[in-house]
Amino acid sequence: MWVRDRLDGLWCDEDFAGWYPRDGRPGLSPAQLATVCVLQFVLGLSDRQAAEAVRCRIDFKYAMAMELDDPGFHHSVLADFRDRLAEGGRADRLLDLALARLKAAGLVRERTTQRTDSTYVLAAVRDLTRLELVTEAVRAALEEVAGAAGHLLDGLVDEEWGQRYGRPARLGKNPTRPKTRILATGNDAARLLEHLYRHGTGRAWGRQVQALRQILVQNYYRDGAGRLLWRTGEDDGFGLAPSSRAIVSPYDTSARYARHGHIVSWSGFSAHLTETCAPDGPNVITDVATTAATTHDSRVLPGIHARLRRRGLLPAEHLVDSGYTSLVHLEQAARDHQVTVTGPLPGNPTRQHRRGEGFGRDDFHIDFDRREVTCPQGQVSQGWHGPYPTSSPTAAPLIVARFTMGQCRPCPVRAQCTTSRESARNVGFPPRELRDLQLRVRTEQQTPQWKARYAVRSGVEGTVNEFAHGHGMRHCRYRGQDKTHIQHVLTAIAVNIE
């Protein structure tokens, strides 16, 4: 009721004009459908329950500005509206509109303090072993082809195939005759695909057939004699696909397997939540991002800032944990958006620094003007190379200063500098601007003022807990990353208006 009384709704039909064609018969109000979708996540309702609430609950009718005798609509309309939301980033547009209303009401403003954290999200699929994955992919493809063009399976599917693929695969981690099953299932998958492409020329195959093709390639390969073999981690040149590409279920090919440490592992996605945390105002969710489970947190930060800039809600200070901090992104946020990213910067990665003995990188004096490095014993480097780009998009470019064997071999403290007997010491460091930023941030992190400011970040973990356990965000309602993102956006709007 507060949303209707104070904001006159979060959106109006004109906000959705670009989503619909100009001709055709009139449809249901998209503003009302969007409101119902949000109320679903406020109260944890299914589509049927939400449609029933629209029909008979007066508070729903008031929130949607409906007449009391309005009969509502069929529950399947909500699924159709979500399909429309999944197109072209429209879910983010829905959040933009809601935040614009809150900003106009003075509930959220630009250049305050915001904080971000992430959590894991479980896909709406069950965990499968690799053998179960291939078996289930064959079964799903057979079901899809049988429904679309069943005559193509004539002469291929027999009683033995019916016994193998008639029911969902539940083989466990230690099935009987595993090697026989692996080869038989792989050969069945290859035969099925060859049969379909031979007899279904020109036909556009559905998602399950395409998923089977990818799963077959990721789990099998053919040797020089043309035999189909099972991929293992030890195969030279024929190993397993990386987790960022490996499909874990034929029913959701966007879900990925990830592991954090030795405790948390899951198949699904990651959700990144950003909220305001100014002491003189309410906490408002300003951004939600849904990524593959294997996407590193630091790669999400530029996208968060770009969306906040579009909404006119960039923070002055952005509190994040160590997963989001990198020299490149700290410098980029300050340069492009005038945002101070506050979070623990990773320490010096050299072996000497980790062990707390010997000469680490910080013990060398770097002279950028003269392009030389002086070691603790007074020797001056003889080479200055780079900056070189690094393989990681989150790592800073690297300059390498090299010393010679003539300098290092007679050094009395060589053992404290390098363990190599065949080469001299090399020192790597980022360019001057990033190096100055690195030293300044590491110094600030040790001050009580910085620690007091950063302590506010921990509050976002309570918001994550509310999302995950209070609104069921831990488990996907829908399949596919786009639909999962819709769930996260609707949950964010629901949390904002509660």
What residue spans do the PLM features occupy?
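Basic, low-complexity segments
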Residues: 1-23
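A short secondary-structure junction motif
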Residues: 10-14, 57, 61, 470
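Trp/Phe/Arg-rich N-terminal binding region typifying the photolyase-homology
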Residues: 17-30, 43-94
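Anion-binding and metal-coordination hotspots
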Residues: 49, 70-71, 79-498
